[in-house]
Amino acid sequence: MRGKKFVAAAVLFAATTSIRAQDLVTYHIDHAATQGLKGLRNIRNHLDVDPTAKITVVTHAQGVDMLFVDAKGEGGIEYAPLVAALRARGVEFEVCEITLKNRDLKKTQFIQEAGFTPSGVVRLAKLQKQGAAYIKP
């Protein structure tokens, strides 16, 4: 019986270790004009070095603007293709619904890669509680 408990504990430890082997990372964007392109570039570089990282981008306030349909950054660079390429690599993009309400925005104004969260700030806190690294470009 004692041997079975040891094996069960070893299996649980191995499973926990393999889960934690994947880095959890949160990118916080609250101003698209100054953080949007820089953040997307950082995320691309992050995944180029560590393709197993699980990355979530949480946007609120003016940060949600980068996920609008037809949104463009500095130099007229379109955000949508950059976001789509990162989404294809497993990156999650989330828009704060409180921002939608406060700015009278509709979900239909956002690209299809955008997901939604009731509160960007609460989502950031929960991701950090789960052990995600916090990066603000």
Predicted regions and their residues:
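Mid-chain, structured segments of secreted extracytoplasmic proteins
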Residues: 61-110
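Loop/turn elements at helix/coil->beta-strand transitions in domains of secreted/extracellular proteins
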Residues: 22-24, 51-55, 88-92, 130-133
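N-terminal targeting signals for Sec/Tat export/insertion, comprising classic cleavable signal peptides
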Residues: 30-57
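Bacterial N-terminal signal peptides that target proteins for export
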Residues: 1-7
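Acidic/histidine-rich, surface-exposed loop or edge segments in extracytoplasmic proteins
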Residues: 22-30, 59-68
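Bacterial N-terminal signal peptides
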Residues: 8-15
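C-terminal partner/receptor-binding element of secreted or periplasmic proteins
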Residues: 112-137
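Sec/Tat signal peptide C-region and signal peptidase I cleavage site
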Residues: 17-21
